[in-house]
Structure formats: C-alpha cells, structure tokens
Design a protein with these regions (language model features):
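N-terminal Rossmann-like NAD(P)+-binding domain of SDR-like oxidoreductases, especially those catalyzing
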Residues: 1-175, 217, 289
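C-terminal substrate-binding subdomain of Rossmann-fold SDR/epimerase-dehydratase oxidoreductases
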Residues: 5, 18, 24, 57, ...
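Short, surface-exposed alpha-helical segments at coil->helix boundaries
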Residues: 40-41, 153, 189, 247, ...
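Residue-level signature of the cytosolic catalytic core of signaling kinases
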Residues: 48, 180-184, 242, 291
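Short, conserved glycine- and acidic-residue-centered signature motifs
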Residues: 93, 148, 184-185, 276
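A glycine/serine/threonine-rich, flexible loop-to-helix segment
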Residues: 126-127, 182-190
Length: 304
C-alpha cells in the first residue's frame, strides 16, 4: 500500500533523509516545516517528484490535512538552537505533539514521535534501557528540550490509552551524516568544520565523556521499521551501541581529514551528560534492527 505520509520537520537533517526514503518506497510525502532550522536546500532535489509536496507551517498551530501516517520530527535538536529560544523549543515539543496527535485522532492515522536520548538526562544507568526513567534537571539550560520531549512522550501514551490513537515512540541517540548544519553546535559537525579549517578542535571537559554515533541511513531504516511494525508502540532506543569518548572522536576526525588542528580544552557545560550509550536489545527483538555503518566509514561518507 502506498501511504500518504506527513513528515513534520521534513526539511531538517533527519527529516529530509526520511522524506527521501519514503519517496524511494513509492509513497507520497507531505513535508511540513517552518524553516526555523530546516533548510530548503535539504529537500531541493525532491521538488521534481510528483509525490512530494512542501507545506510551510509551524506545528505550534493546528492544521487540517489528510494523511495515513504522521512522523513528528519538528523541533530544534541542537543546543545552539534550542537554548537560543527555549520557550519556542518547549512550545514546539508540547503544542506540536498535541496538534499532531489531534490530527492523527481525527483522521485515524498512525503517528510516530521522534523522541530523544536526552530523556535519560545524565544517566546513572549504563547503557540506557527503555525502562530507565532518567536523571534530568527540570530547570537547567537543557530542560526546554529534555523535558519537552518527556512531556511529548507522556502525551503520546495518554492519547493512546485514552483515545486509542495508534502511536509509535522512538528515542534517537546521536546521529550524523550529510545535511547536518555546520553551525548547530553538535559535536560531530563542530569537529569536522574545525578540522577542515585546521582550526583548534574544541573539547569541553577532559574529553572522557562518551557518546554513541549512528549514521543517518541506519537511523532512517530503524524509523521505518518502527512505523511498519504492528502491535508495538515503544518507546524504543534507536542508536549505535558503539561507544566512543569525545577525545577519540576528535582524534578520528583529525586523522580522516588530514587536519593540522590541535585540541583545545574548555569548561564542561552545565548538565552535559558524562556517558551516553543505547541498549538496543529491544530494537533487535521487536524490529530486527541494528546499525551497520561503523563510525570510521560513516565519517568518510559524511564528507563525500
């Protein structure tokens, strides 16, 4: 069956790759974006496809539209953007979830929420499993994003339990690949830009904090498997369980770019997680999914 898919945040980094994958499956795509952080260049190559349509709209406002499936990806996802306008960020998370859930309820659509590993905060459990409730500062500089996503998850399950809306919830861990914004403040894009300029690589803290990096094509595969899976609502972790220190990432980027950059150390930001790694046992069991692109290969592809 060729579905009509509504992708909010469809002009963003992950959203644009998702739109592309859906079109490659022969489906129709309504790409909804307010272009706050999304970019038209991300979807320019899709404009000639008759099954692709752009809708300029902000999810904080309701919209009347028909779709079989809704992928809710609308929200600034990097610290630079969500800390610049924290009120807008939490409104997008909460009001956006409410409006998209209301739409899904009205038209009987299946709806998937793009949640985040940030719901775990600075975790005391490692690796993070879906049953872990998290360690989040509700009033810190990151709380507009972290708590906004936690509220959105709650709303999704409330709509499912009370109104029988057919929901899916995924928790996305660090993702990288083509179309990342170079100025979004996320560690992979920061390091690559600095390395290509032979500028100092900025590490916050001592570089011993860890992250897990998933290539965007692997993530999109997991997203589609989750949306297609009947009878499983989540939440489910989607990320690469390979764990690297920030220092290891910096050294790899310098090596692969042939950069002359030196490493500079800066104070660690408040509430920055010290360890972050997904347990993907549930994704393996329920979706038959695990990432296949190793970090070294993905970094090479990102710059190609």
């Amino acid at each position: 069956m060729a579905y009509v898919n509504l992708v909010t945040g469809g002009a963003g980094f992950i959203g644009s790759h998702l739109c592309e994958a859906l079109l490659n499956r022969g489906e129709e795509v309504l790409c909804l974006d307010n272009f706050f952080t999304g970019r038209k260049v991300n979807i320019a190559h899709l404009l000639g496809n008759s099954r692709f349509e752009i809708v300029r709209h902000d999810v904080v406002n309701p919209i009347i539209i028909e779709a079989d499936r809704v992928f809710n990806f609308a929200c600034p996802a990097s610290p630079v953007h969500y800390q610049h306008n924290p009120v807008k960020t939490i409104k997008t998370n909460v009001m956006g979830a409410l409006n998209m859930l209301g739409l899904a309820k009205r038209v009987g659509a299946r709806i998937l929420q793009a949640s985040t590993s940030e719901v775990y905060g600075d975790p005391t459990v490692h690796p993070q499993v879906e049953s872990y409730w998290g360690n989040v500062n509700p009033v810190g500089p990151r709380s507009c994003y972290d708590e906004g996503k936690r509220v959105a998850e709650s709303l999704f399950f409330d709509y499912h339990n009370q109104n029988k809306v057919d929901i899916r919830v995924i928790r996305i861990f660090n993702t990288y690949g083509p179309r990342m914004l170079v100025n979004d403040g996320r560690v992979v894009s920061n390091f690559v830009v600095q390395a290509l300029k032979n500028a100092p690589i900025s590490i916050y803290g001592e570089g011993g904090q860890t992250r897990s990096f998933c290539y965007v094509s692997d993530l999109v595969d997991g997203i589609l498997r989750m949306m297609d899976r009947d009878g499983f609502h989540g939440p489910v972790n989607l990320g690469n369980p390979g764990e690297f220190t920030i220092l290891q990432l910096a050294e790899l980027v310098i090596e692969l770019t042939g950069s002359k950059s030196k490493i500079e150390y800066h104070p660690l930001p408040e509430n920055d997680p010290t360890r972050r790694r997904p347990d993907i046992s549930l994704a393996r069991e329920k979706l038959g999914w695990e990432p296949v692109v190793p970090l070294r290969e993905g970094q090479t592809e990102e710059r190609a």
